[in-house]
């Protein structure tokens, strides 16, 4: 089952596709990392058969036998408020009136605490406890066969897999095609020219894309954005898991490159 705004690549694997709403098409709250609870109001209606996520989930829950009879998003928020003491003082009506309130907020008279642990931390000494972390080497290291390090990440213009930003004409016009970033030194060693194509290979796969020189990279490093399905960076990356966090090592692996 896939619930999304667009027919993304993931939808090709789905048995059921549920058309969902975008951020500007639904009511609710957004809580940022600064602990500010902000009220959001739908600016435009959902198109076609698309529905707000809450009502899709509510109806599925009812189909599974749950006693979910919410009629407005405020009912869900108030239920959540009853289970979270930190937002106890932030009622729905208060959000409608103020637009946003920062938690912890204990009661209606609390303006909201933008700074926590003002006097002390909740430790025996009252001070923050800092723990040194040990550096752990990646699972796969460069060698004579694959002498370079591949790093993957986002481009400024495209978010995650680009399901929204690659459908935004202005952003997609700036960065329309897959690209591989290579250091000036490695461009010279490999005989590459900016604007040409380069093939990057790992023990798991290969891809070919447009090459761009990047002086911010050190010799031996290359960077590939992971937002392009037509040159998917994860064809190359290592799926080895971190032993503690169980996070796959998609950001680092050994590769080699050559002119395409």
Indicate residue ranges for each PLM-predicted region:
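Short, glycine-/Ser/Thr-/acidic-enriched flexible segments
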Residues: 5-8, 22-25, 43-45, 49, ...
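Short beta-strand/loop segments at the ligand-binding rim of alpha/beta enzyme cores
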Residues: 1
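Short strand-coil-strand connectors
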Residues: 40, 144, 201-205
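Long, low-complexity segments enriched in small/aliphatic residues
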Residues: 73-170
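Flexible glycine/proline-rich, aromatic-decorated loop/lid segments
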Residues: 5-41
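Short helix/loop capping segments that flank catalytic or ligand/cofactor-binding pockets
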Residues: 10-11, 27-28, 40, 131-132, ...
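Long, contiguous, secondary-structure-rich segments that constitute the structural scaffold
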Residues: 47-101, 161, 165-181, 185-260
């Amino acid at each position: 089952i896939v619930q999304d705004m667009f027919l993304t690549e993931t939808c090709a694997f789905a048995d059921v596709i549920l058309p969902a709403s975008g951020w500007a098409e639904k009511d609710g709250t957004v809580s940022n990392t600064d602990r500010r609870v902000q009220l959001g109001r739908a600016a435009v209606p959902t198109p076609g058969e698309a529905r707000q996520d809450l009502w899709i989930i509510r109806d599925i829950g009812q189909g599974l036998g749950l006693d979910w009879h919410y009629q407005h998003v405020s009912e869900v928020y108030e239920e959540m408020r009853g289970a979270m003491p930190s937002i106890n003082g932030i009622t729905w009506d208060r959000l409608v009136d103020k637009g946003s309130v920062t938690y912890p907020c204990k009661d209606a008279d609390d303006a909201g605490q933008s700074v926590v642990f003002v006097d002390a931390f909740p430790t025996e000494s009252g001070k923050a406890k800092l723990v040194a972390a040990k550096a752990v080497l990646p699972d796969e290291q460069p060698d004579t066969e694959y002498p370079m390090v591949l790093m993957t990440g986002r481009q400024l213009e495209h978010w995650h897999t680009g399901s929204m930003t690659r459908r935004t004409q202005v952003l997609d016009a700036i960065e329309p095609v897959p690209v591989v970033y290579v250091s000036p030194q490695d461009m010279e060693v490999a005989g590459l020219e900016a604007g040409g194509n380069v093939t990057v290979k790992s023990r798991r796969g290969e891809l070919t894309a447009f090459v761009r020189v990047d002086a911010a990279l050190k010799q031996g490093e290359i960077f590939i954005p992971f937002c392009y399905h037509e040159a998917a960076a994860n064809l190359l990356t290592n799926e080895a898991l971190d032993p503690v966090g169980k996070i796959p090592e998609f950001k680092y692996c050994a590769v080699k490159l050559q002119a395409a």
